[in-house]
């Protein structure tokens, strides 16, 4: 087909646009990835010797980048080893799944293996669904097929790309030099175009990314149908955004149409001959599935008798580019959309719809051509937003699904790019993709479900190679192995004390900060540990469980009951020392007391060999060797090795004098000073 003056003018505009885009991309500096571990990893792998002034600087730079990537001060040796193994594992994956797994950023080897196994199962199931009916027939798919899989089919053919080619016949009808078009034919094609299914088959589309481009044949093939009810439920800002994105999408399709060779599909009319289009067969590249009338829908005949499916309560509204930009005014004859609060919208009359469908008549109205964008080929049929791959489109379409579910309900948490949208959406549907069949508990990720199911099966696949103990989670195994290796990776930045577990470090840091996050709701007293709060709360529960007739007291558990009961009945405590007759309420107190008689000192200092009868005395003694002073004054910054010394020091700031003389009433901050003062009264 010869190109007219209008076509040459469009090619000139295309060249100018490409040069402008290239200049703009050259002027913009590359964005700084920042100091995150991922950025350091990327810089570490791409570092070149020429970037440094010399070998010493190159080595120093590599050490700095590797340190920023692996974070040895925060990770253990096992975690660093697992990170390196995970990187190599992702590198050796097959090309068809490597990029998809890397985009999901698995945090452990176990999670990466689970993702690869899921993808392999889905790819195998896809290959089984490809049905070949002989040469020259179509490939019918229940789901979009990756390009690599489609190429294996004998019926999938790719024609060589032509260097110079005029637009396709259907697009030429819209963009041709003649502004006169048959509005009746445009309306027929628009109304007969199939509706895109919003929901993909359950559990398949999210894991399958379309690697090949999927292009519509012409502008009418990507006309989007939105019911007036759905359009009315959108707020003004979202309507404006939809218009902008639809216009951008049409411009992309316009620029792509002239570069893609057409593929004739049997049974589908792409010209102007007036033949019927068969809606029961879809082209593989369109990515559409055949659809018949669903329950509650009825067929209607268009002007040439082509059947199309439409819901009885939804009027299809075709968003052509001029309407998407808001340049085509809504006349009283055509009607205009109202807000959902009014609820009195009526479909436009037959003649008005015909005029609206014939509104865009020239290439100028479709916007300037843009450069070929192979990474934006998947259009949302509801808002017109463009996506680089099919999995992102499916994930985006669930937003519209949730909007339909939440009409009339307060579901504002779904919008605004909430990262937990998928979980909220599944909660609205009353089901989740990953559900435990034993207890019914639902999870947002398959790896979480696998970890949970081990609580039912009792499976413990992670075994310690030293003692043979098994664990259900890899993290629990790493934590256990520190008891054998003596590793203590968590260090207190204040005093330098090291710990094997992060929870112990957090508990220790409260000594320095004075934080007491556990507060009693009865009296307001705060505690640094939850166990201390539990013990304290029992003092407020006097009316519970075990009342006494002798003293009217009540205790919260059976152990104090037995102790108090023995004090009332036998006038003695439960644990009595056979040597001196002294009694104790707890067995551990009796054991500690008996060491004063036996002279036993089971706790030995490894540095000087001195023995102690109590573990607390050994810990206090070891601070003499280490010089550790974990107790810091927040007023002046002084540090102390014992908590009692810090408490005594704090009284110099607060002015507290808790020791009072019973003779004259004078108060003192230390008990030793009170004792010295009392000697003045006794002589």
Swiss-Prot record:
<protein>
    <recommendedName>
        <fullName>Zinc finger protein 263</fullName>
    </recommendedName>
</protein>
<dbReference type="GO" id="GO:0043565">
    <property type="term" value="F:sequence-specific DNA binding"/>
</dbReference>
<keyword id="KW-0479">Metal-binding</keyword>
<dbReference type="GO" id="GO:1990837">
    <property type="term" value="F:sequence-specific double-stranded DNA binding"/>
</dbReference>
<dbReference type="InterPro" id="IPR003309">
    <property type="entry name" value="SCAN_dom"/>
</dbReference>
<dbReference type="Pfam" id="PF01352">
    <property type="entry name" value="KRAB"/>
</dbReference>
<feature type="modified residue" description="Phosphoserine">
    <location>
        <position position="166"/>
    </location>
</feature>
<keyword id="KW-0862">Zinc</keyword>
<feature type="cross-link" description="Glycyl lysine isopeptide (Lys-Gly) (interchain with G-Cter in SUMO2)">
    <location>
        <position position="376"/>
    </location>
</feature>
<feature type="zinc finger region" description="C2H2-type 3">
    <location>
        <begin position="462"/>
        <end position="484"/>
    </location>
</feature>
<keyword id="KW-0832">Ubl conjugation</keyword>
<keyword id="KW-0238">DNA-binding</keyword>
<feature type="cross-link" description="Glycyl lysine isopeptide (Lys-Gly) (interchain with G-Cter in SUMO2)">
    <location>
        <position position="285"/>
    </location>
</feature>
<feature type="zinc finger region" description="C2H2-type 6">
    <location>
        <begin position="575"/>
        <end position="597"/>
    </location>
</feature>
<feature type="cross-link" description="Glycyl lysine isopeptide (Lys-Gly) (interchain with G-Cter in SUMO2)">
    <location>
        <position position="299"/>
    </location>
</feature>
<dbReference type="GO" id="GO:0005634">
    <property type="term" value="C:nucleus"/>
</dbReference>
<dbReference type="GO" id="GO:0001227">
    <property type="term" value="F:DNA-binding transcription repressor activity, RNA polymerase II-specific"/>
</dbReference>
<dbReference type="GO" id="GO:0000978">
    <property type="term" value="F:RNA polymerase II cis-regulatory region sequence-specific DNA binding"/>
</dbReference>
<dbReference type="Pfam" id="PF13465">
    <property type="entry name" value="zf-H2C2_2"/>
</dbReference>
<comment type="subunit">
    <text>Interacts with a number of proteins involved in chromatin modification and transcriptional corepression including DNMT1, DNMT3A, HDAC2, PHF8, TRIM28/KAP1, SETDB1, EZH2, UHRF1, CBX3/HP1-gamma, and CBX5/HP1-alpha; recruits these proteins to the SIX3 promoter region, leading to SIX3 transcriptional repression. Interacts with MAPK3/ERK1 and MAPK1/ERK2.</text>
</comment>
<feature type="cross-link" description="Glycyl lysine isopeptide (Lys-Gly) (interchain with G-Cter in SUMO2)">
    <location>
        <position position="573"/>
    </location>
</feature>
<dbReference type="InterPro" id="IPR038269">
    <property type="entry name" value="SCAN_sf"/>
</dbReference>
<dbReference type="InterPro" id="IPR001909">
    <property type="entry name" value="KRAB"/>
</dbReference>
<comment type="function">
    <text>Transcription factor that binds to the consensus sequence 5'-TCCTCCC-3' and acts as a transcriptional repressor. Binds to the promoter region of SIX3 and recruits other proteins involved in chromatin modification and transcriptional corepression, resulting in methylation of the promoter and transcriptional repression. Acts as a transcriptional repressor of HS3ST1 and HS3ST3A1 via binding to gene promoter regions.</text>
</comment>
<feature type="cross-link" description="Glycyl lysine isopeptide (Lys-Gly) (interchain with G-Cter in SUMO2)">
    <location>
        <position position="157"/>
    </location>
</feature>
<keyword id="KW-0805">Transcription regulation</keyword>
<feature type="region of interest" description="Disordered">
    <location>
        <begin position="147"/>
        <end position="185"/>
    </location>
</feature>
<dbReference type="GO" id="GO:0000981">
    <property type="term" value="F:DNA-binding transcription factor activity, RNA polymerase II-specific"/>
</dbReference>
<feature type="zinc finger region" description="C2H2-type 4">
    <location>
        <begin position="490"/>
        <end position="512"/>
    </location>
</feature>
<dbReference type="InterPro" id="IPR036051">
    <property type="entry name" value="KRAB_dom_sf"/>
</dbReference>
<feature type="domain" description="KRAB">
    <location>
        <begin position="217"/>
        <end position="289"/>
    </location>
</feature>
<keyword id="KW-0804">Transcription</keyword>
<feature type="domain" description="SCAN box">
    <location>
        <begin position="41"/>
        <end position="123"/>
    </location>
</feature>
<keyword id="KW-0863">Zinc-finger</keyword>
<dbReference type="GO" id="GO:0003700">
    <property type="term" value="F:DNA-binding transcription factor activity"/>
</dbReference>
<keyword id="KW-0539">Nucleus</keyword>
<dbReference type="GO" id="GO:0000122">
    <property type="term" value="P:negative regulation of transcription by RNA polymerase II"/>
</dbReference>
<dbReference type="GO" id="GO:0006357">
    <property type="term" value="P:regulation of transcription by RNA polymerase II"/>
</dbReference>
<feature type="zinc finger region" description="C2H2-type 1">
    <location>
        <begin position="378"/>
        <end position="400"/>
    </location>
</feature>
<dbReference type="GO" id="GO:0006355">
    <property type="term" value="P:regulation of DNA-templated transcription"/>
</dbReference>
<comment type="similarity">
    <text>Belongs to the krueppel C2H2-type zinc-finger protein family.</text>
</comment>
<feature type="region of interest" description="Disordered">
    <location>
        <begin position="322"/>
        <end position="368"/>
    </location>
</feature>
């Amino acid at each position: 087909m010869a190109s007219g003056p209008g076509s040459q003018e469009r090619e000139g505009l295309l060249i100018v646009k490409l040069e402008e885009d290239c200049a703009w991309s050259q002027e913009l500096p590359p964005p700084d990835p920042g100091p995150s571990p991922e950025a350091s990893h990327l810089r570490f792998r791409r570092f070149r010797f020429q970037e440094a002034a010399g070998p010493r600087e190159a080595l120093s730079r590599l050490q700095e980048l590797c340190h920023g990537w692996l974070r040895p001060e925060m990770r253990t040796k096992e975690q660093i080893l697992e990170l390196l193994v995970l990187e190599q594992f992702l590198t050796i994956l097959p090309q068809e799944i490597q990029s998809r797994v890397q985009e999901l950023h698995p945090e452990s080897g176990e999670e990466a293996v689970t993702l690869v196994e899921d993808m392999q199962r889905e790819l195998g199931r896809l290959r089984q669904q490809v049905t070949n009916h002989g040469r020259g027939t179509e490939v019918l798919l229940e789901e979009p097929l990756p390009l690599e899989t489609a190429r294996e089919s004998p019926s999938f053919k790719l024609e060589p790309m032509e260097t110079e080619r005029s637009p396709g016949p259907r697009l030429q009808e819209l963009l041709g030099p003649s502004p006169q078009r048959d509005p009746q034919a445009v309306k027929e094609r628009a109304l007969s175009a199939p509706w895109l299914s919003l929901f993909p088959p359950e559990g398949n589309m999210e894991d399958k990314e379309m690697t090949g481009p999927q292009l519509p044949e012409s502008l009418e093939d990507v006309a989007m149908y939105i019911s007036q009810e759905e359009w009315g439920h959108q707020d003004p800002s979202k309507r404006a955004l939809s218009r902008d994105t639809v216009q951008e999408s049409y411009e992309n399709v316009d620029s792509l149409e002239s570069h893609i060779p057409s593929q004739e599909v049997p049974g589908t009319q792409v010209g102007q001959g007036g033949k019927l289009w068969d809606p029961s067969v879809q082209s593989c590249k369109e990515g559409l599935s055949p659809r018949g009338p669903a329950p509650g829908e009825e067929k209607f005949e268009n002007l040439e008798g082509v059947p199309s499916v439409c819901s009885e309560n939804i009027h299809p509204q075709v968003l052509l580019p001029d309407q998407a930009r808001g340049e085509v005014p809504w006349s009283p004859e055509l009607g205009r959309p109202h807000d959902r609060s009014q609820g009195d919208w009526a479909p436009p009359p037959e003649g008005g719809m015909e005029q609206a469908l014939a509104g865009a008549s020239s290439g100028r109205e479709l916007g300037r051509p843009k450069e070929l964008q192979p990474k934006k080929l998947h259009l949302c049929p509801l808002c017109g937003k463009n996506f680089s791959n099919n999995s992102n489109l499916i994930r985006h379409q669930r937003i519209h699904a949730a909007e339909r579910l939440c009409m009339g309900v307060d579901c504002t948490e779904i919008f605004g790019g909430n990262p937990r949208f998928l979980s909220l959406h599944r909660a609205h549907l009353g089901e989740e993709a990953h559900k435990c069949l034993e207890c019914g508990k639902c999870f947002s990720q398959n790896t979480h479900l696998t970890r949970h199911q081990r609580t039912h099966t009792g499976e413990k696949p992670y075994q310690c190679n030293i003692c043979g103990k098994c664990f259900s989670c890899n993290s629990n195994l790493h934590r256990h192995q520190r008891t054998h290796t003596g590793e203590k990776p968590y260090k207190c930045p204040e005093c330098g004390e090291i710990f094997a577990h992060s929870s112990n470090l957090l508990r220790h840091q409260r000594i320095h900060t004075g934080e007491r996050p556990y507060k009693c709701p009865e009296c307001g007293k705060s505690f640094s540990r939850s166990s201390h709060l539990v013990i304290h709360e029992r003092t407020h529960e006097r009316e519970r469980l075990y009342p006494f007739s002798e003293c009217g007291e009540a205790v919260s558990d059976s152990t104090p009951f037995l102790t108090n009961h023995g004090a009332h009945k036998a006038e003695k405590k439960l644990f009595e020392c056979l040597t001196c007759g002294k009694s104790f309420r707890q067995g551990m107190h009796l054991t500690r007391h008996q060491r004063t008689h036996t002279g036993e000192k089971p706790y030995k200092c490894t540095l000087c060999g001195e023995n102690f009868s109590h573990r607390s005395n050994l810990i206090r003694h070891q601070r003499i060797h280490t010089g550790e002073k974990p107790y810091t004054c927040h007023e002046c910054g002084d540090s102390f090795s014992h908590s009692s010394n810090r408490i005594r020091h704090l009284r110099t700031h607060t002015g507290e004098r808790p020791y009072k003389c019973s003779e004259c009433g004078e108060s003192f901050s230390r008990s030793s000073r009170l004792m010295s003062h009392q000697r003045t009264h006794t002589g």
